[in-house]
From Swiss-Prot:
This is UDP-N-acetylmuramoylalanine--D-glutamate ligase. It comes from Aromatoleum aromaticum (strain DSM 19018 / LMG 30748 / EbN1). GO terms for biological process: cell division; cell wall organization; peptidoglycan biosynthetic process; regulation of cell shape. It catalyses: UDP-N-acetyl-alpha-D-muramoyl-L-alanine + D-glutamate + ATP = UDP-N-acetyl-alpha-D-muramoyl-L-alanyl-D-glutamate + ADP + phosphate + H(+). Belongs to the MurCDEF family. PANTHER family: UDP-N-ACETYLMURAMOYLALANINE--D-GLUTAMATE LIGASE (PTHR43692:SF1). ATP binds at residues 122-128.
Length: 466
């Protein structure tokens, strides 16, 4: 018997998470209504096959979808403060989300006490850190899965295991967006981290303070807090009475904290005074990825009790994820082409630039989502030889970079931008696609943007794939 049995549940939004919630609620005996403003949402056929009794509402709808409803499950893309979700709250209807349903499921299945949950959020680096943390836990012998915002949906993993009659994961490594955290209750992870907080999604939040406060709710519960001491907003999230592990790209002050130190001219990842791994041996490019690696090690120590010394081999073996400062092509004179199409906000692009150890020709621009582009200026001055701008908010980026003494120009599309960037790059330079913007003004998604960039780079004379 489930708390969902017999309840009339409305699922708002039929993306990956919404579809997983709908399928799970139907499996647990709920009466189901699903509403999506799109006429043909992507999961429609799957929903009809897996939940044939579900009532499906597509296109325009109003508050009538709340009639008879006991519980409203929100997809991450649905803002709980406006529209039907706000009306549901006004009527006193409880709101839930995928992470709350996962927590409830683990309790009802009687496995929560044997399960470890590691939760990861941050403006930048959370997908890489999630994948790395899961890989480290697996290397230590645990049945660990990465799920959530990283895909697959956590409830999809749960349903697949149950359908196969397989044991449930010993460790869930969950990437959580701020949108997912908004509807998260009672997850109580064994360890959680906020990697960083910079401008993003300010089209949804009133400002950076509200955005940061939403991220900080990941620490709800009793688990170990893993905090970035180099980010003032994150460092301020420390809660009284909680176990803390701090990390950063600086030298650690405490013996159980993580950081970077210089020894005889070489940088090392360390825990306290103990050297773990030379930065030069880290496969992931950039000091920002060193910080992500330190966060992953701290999560495994704090949440799983695994000593970092056991995990250095797995760190070296981890090859990273596509579209995150990924080397995709190289010219015969040593110019390298890097795809950071996942760099959809200013903080990500600043981190990518600062992670480079050579002059950079930057390709940036797209849908800026209301961000302040001024933090790009210092990083561009430090690292960039030139900047080629594309997309809707190219003029706003140009305005933020005016007077930087770095060459700026516009290109009509990404293919032309790659050609122009290659012309400006000198031997040994990097051409970096790190847009600091979303992609939907010109592309289907960030992966499509990456495909166009990679194809354009590999068409250039004397360029080969990497």
């Amino acid at each position: 018997m489930s708390a969902l049995t017999g309840k009339h549940v409305l699922v708002l939004g039929l993306g990956e998470s919404g579809l997983a919630m709908a399928r799970w609620c139907a499996l647990r005996g709920a009466r189901l209504r699903v509403a999506d403003s799109r006429q043909t949402p992507p999961g429609l056929d799957t929903l009809r096959a897996d939940a044939p009794l579900a009532e499906i509402v597509v296109g325009n709808f109003g508050a009538e979808v709340l009639s008879g409803i006991d519980l409203v499950a929100l997809s991450p893309g649905v803002d709980p403060r406006i529209g039907i979700a706000a009306e549901a709250r006004h009527r006193g209807l409880p709101l839930t989300g995928e992470m709350s349903l996962l927590a409830q499921a683990l309790d009802e299945l009687g496995v929560r006490a044997q399960t470890r949950i590691l939760a990861i959020t941050g403006t930048n680096g959370k997908t890489t850190t999630t994948a790395l943390t899961a890989a480290l836990a697996q290397a230590a012998g645990l049945d660990a899965v990465a799920a959530g915002n990283i895909s697959p949906a956590a409830l999809d993993v749960l349903m697949d295991r149950l359908a196969q009659g397989a044991p449930l994961p010993e460790c869930w490594v969950l990437e959580l967006s701020s949108f997912q955290i908004e509807t998260m209750h009672a997850l109580d992870p064994e360890a959680a981290t906020v990697l960083n907080v910079t401008d993003d999604h300010l089209d949804r939040y009133a400002g950076l303070d509200e955005y940061a406060a939403t991220k900080a709710a990941i620490f709800e519960g009793r688990g170990v807090q893993v905090l970035n001491r180099d980010d003032a907003r994150v460092a301020a999230m420390a809660l009284p009475g909680r176990s803390l592990i701090r990390f950063g790209a600086s030298a650690p002050a405490a013996t159980d904290d993580y950081g970077l130190v210089e020894v005889a001219g070489a940088a090392w990842l360390v825990r306290g005074r103990e050297r773990l791994l030379a930065l030069a041996d880290l496969p992931l490019a950039g000091r920002h990825n060193a910080a992500n690696t330190l966060a992953a090690l701290a999560l495994c120590e704090g949440g799983l009790g695994i000593a970092p010394q056991r995990l250095t081999g797995a760190v070296v073996a981890f090859r990273g994820l596509p579209h995150r400062v990924e080397l995709v092509a190289e010219r015969s004179d040593g110019v390298r082409f890097y795809d950071d199409s996942k760099g959809t906000n200013v903080g990500a692009t600043v981190a990518a630039l600062d992670g480079m150890d050579c002059p950079v020709v930057l390709i940036a621009g797209g849908d800026g989502k209301g961000q302040d582009f001024s933090p790009l200026r210092e990083a561009v001055v430090r690292r960039a030889r030139a900047v080629v701008l594309i997309g809707r908010d190219a003029p706003r980026i140009e305005s933020a970079l005016q007077g930087s003494a770095v060459a700026l120009e516009h290109a009509p599309d990404l293919d032309a931008a790659v050609v122009r960037a290659s012309e400006q790059a000198q031997p040994g330079d990097a051409v970096l696609l790190s847009p600091a913007c979303a992609s939907l003004d010109m592309f289907r998604n960030y992966a499509h943007r990456a495909e166009v960039f990679i194809a354009a780079a590999r068409r250039l004379p004397e360029v080969r794939a990497s």
